[in-house]
Amino acid sequence: MASMSVDPVTEPRMYQQTLLQDGLCDLLDANKFVDCILKIKDKEFPCHRLVLAATSPYFKAMFLSDLEESKKREIVLKDIEPGVMGMILRYIYTSDINLTEQNVQDIFMAANMYQIPSIFSVCVSYLQQKLVLSNCLAIFRLGLLLDCPRLAMEARDFICDRYLLIIRDQDFHQLGPSELAAIITCDSLNVEREESVFESLMDWVEYDTDERTKELPELLHCVRFRLMPTSYFKEKVEGHRLIRTNQELKKELQLIKDAQKGLLHRVKRSSHRKEGKSAEFESDDDDEDGLLPGILNDNPRFGMFQSDLILMINDAGTVAYDVGANECFVASSSTEIPKNHCSLVTKENQIFVVGGLRYNEENKDQPFSSYFLQFDPMSSEWLGMPSLPNPRCLFGLVEAENSIYVVGGKELKEGERALDSVMIYDRQSFKWGESDPLPYAVYGHGIVSHKGLVYVIGGKTESKKCLRRVCVYDPSKFEWKDLAPMKTARSLFGTAVHKNKIYVVTGVTDNGLTSTVEVYDIASNSWSEFVDFPQERSSLNLVELGGFLYAIGGFAMMPNETTEKLEPTEMNDIWKFDEEENCWNGILREIRYAAGATVLGVRLNTLRLTKI
């Protein structure tokens, strides 16, 4: 008989612990050796003193003391509900507890009050896993209240990562001064501009001006004014109504103005700042070992390492390219991106992918749909969203008025009928619905949004003829309107908004590929010719990034290496338009990550990314 490997330490110990706990539970169920009854309101809980003392320092101290309770069989407990104590005792005897969002806070506080570390730790782990935007501030405050650094720091890190979303929540205004300070002093705050920190602080103060103005002298030391533009500091900070009339605050801000002129003051080590009074200062030369006051802190925040990147998304992974540094980063190694997808970056820099074919056998009425994914820069993962009904390809994807539009395209089924339908995803209700259809069926078109309006450009009709047609949709009026047509009918081209104009680059015409470029002036509703792209292409990616236009990839007709016959060939290069020289300049001959990818111009924090 084959011998079984047994850890001589771990397995017997675990077996003994289980045996002991099961035995104690059996004794309790049989009401054997019960020597203690916990009475809470009208509910009684029989138990064993030895078990309580072994589990809780609170009960151990009670039973070993000379207090009256140490001799009583019946112990009355207050400040706890019977249901909560019942769950705690169940855990003590069985290691089983059913935590929910409704009961976890009561159990957590009871575990803290009665010093039961095992339940305390279980509650901490549960709350860490349940951190979301709607509860992170409450969990942070709870961690501070119960003196639990592990929970408070986890919640604070979550808040710092999503600070610009958190400050919109009404709970933000309920933070106490010390709680707010603990957040906005962090280097890990995910903000690109320090102005956001100052504005959120003043918003918090103005929620209860009478009570909170007195907290400003201390809280202003959490803001890094030296990271702000001088013009903003002068106009918005010094000019703020709560600051310009306060002499104490003006004295504090004088330190910033001195620092802007190159004079840094340091706090004397021997001095102690008292509430409501300024610290004593001396010049840098007088005290080399002095400390800079907090108000002069100029360390960049975590979010200030955001960079303009070209993001390439395909089924092999997601890679970001930094044009200025000529460096590539892995944004996500996920290979779950569907083929034939479209991608979108919103004005809030949120990244989405729609496309592919998804089969759900449980949905008998509509088993086929398309994938809908959102990129989470915190985890570097693509998160599943409600799938798109009515799967399609060669459609347009755009955002306007906080909704995502899927416009036109071709059906992903036999016949591949061109579509005029428009699907809309409401980011408030998290649901797909139908919007007003296009005036005509179209696929392979270009689509952009600008100032809340959706522009549909060119494409092909059911008859496979290229279009010059351009129309605009106004979500506030629920109507489509025709605009001036393009000069050249085309489909499968690159398009982007740049300096309030819409650029259309290369594409497919009824006669083949084209290298022509034209520009639509939104203000005058007119088209004009532009500098041709250096090569005829289709499916070129055009992005606006950091005030410049970049053209990436696409397909060109290139000679076969053996037959010299022209064949469609995928290009993986990057071009940039030079406005001073008025020409397209190649900046990278080949970037393999662009193969089969959709391309976006985004801003991501390179500290989160893995450099290739």
UniProtKB/Swiss-Prot annotation:
Gene of this entry: klhl40a
UniProt repeat feature Kelch, residue ranges: 350-402, 403-452, 453-500, 502-547, 549-604
Keyword field contains Methyltransferase: no
Native source species: Danio rerio (Zebrafish)
Disulfide-bond pairs as recorded: none
Name of the molecule in the record: Kelch-like protein 40a
Localization in the cell: Cytoplasm; Cytoplasm, Myofibril, Sarcomere, A band; Cytoplasm, Myofibril, Sarcomere, I band
Alphabetized PANTHER family for the sequence: KELCH PROTEIN, KELCH-LIKE PROTEIN 40
Record's compositionally biased regions (Basic residues): 266-275
Organism taxonomic ancestry: Eukaryota, Metazoa, Chordata, Craniata, Vertebrata
Keyword set, alphabetical order: Cytoplasm, Developmental protein, Kelch repeat, Repeat, Ubl conjugation pathway
The organism's place on the tree of life at top rank: Eukaryota
